[in-house]
C-alpha cells in the first residue's frame, strides 16, 4: 500500500500534500527521495525510508519522534525538526525532548 493511500484511510476527507524533504541545515545536497514530508490539515509527518519517524501538530506546537533508527534517519529528523522551528542538536537531546518513554 502506498503511503498516500494509507493516510487517506485515516484522513478520508482531507487534502494530503506529499513533498520531498530538502536539506537546508544539513550539508547534503539532497536526501535522494528517502525523506518525505506529508501535510494533512494541522498534522505534519516525516517519512524516512517509508517509515513514519516523526510528526508535529501546527496547532498544539507539539512534536514527537518515534525512533531515531539510523544515522541517516537521524539526519532526516534533525532537518525536519529544524525546518519546523524546533530545537534539534544531538541524538540525546532529540530523544530526551521528543521521544516518549516506553514502560
Task: Give the positions of each predicted feature.
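Terminal leader/tail segments of proteins
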Residues: 1-103
Amino acid at each position: 500500500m502506498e503511503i498516500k493511500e494509507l493516510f487517506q484511510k485515516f484522513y478520508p476527507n482531507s487534502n494530503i500534500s506529499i513533498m520531498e524533504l530538502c536539506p537546508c541545515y544539513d550539508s547534503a545536497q539532497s536526501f535522494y527521495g528517502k525523506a518525505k514530508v506529508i501535510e494533512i490539515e494541522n498534522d505534519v509527518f516525516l517519512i524516512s525510508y517509508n517509515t513514519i519517524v516523526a510528526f508535529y501538530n501546527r496547532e498544539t506546537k507539539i512534536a514527537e519522534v518515534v525512533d531515531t533508527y539510523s544515522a541517516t534517519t537521524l539526519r532526516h529528523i534533525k532537518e525536519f525538526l529544524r525546518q519546523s522551528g524546533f530545537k534539534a542538536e544531538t541524538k540525546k537531546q532529540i530523544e530526551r525532548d521528543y521521544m516518549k518513554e516506553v514502560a
